[in-house]
Amino acid sequence: MRMLLTARFNTEAANQLVTEGTLSKIIEGILEHLKPESSYFTAMEGERTCFIVFDMTESSQLPTICEPFFQVGAKVAVRPVMNAEDLRTGLSQYPG
């Protein structure tokens, strides 16, 4: 299932990781593990934020997906998402 992970990094904790040179290594490890369809990075309400679209085949994967973010104090949200083709398919099945 296509999922959207949003992670917002605590500014002080992320600043420390940047100073130590480890934030980029952590992000690269996460991306290598998830093999995302796409990933985007921005600032949101004063926090470093990433949006990662990836495929999750089983809910039991959730702990290993989220834990690297939790370890650095990030706030994480994961939710299923659709692309336009998924939406068309879903709407075509609506009986109304």
Task: Place the predicted regions along the sequence by residue.
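Conserved, structured core segments of small domains
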Residues: 1-96
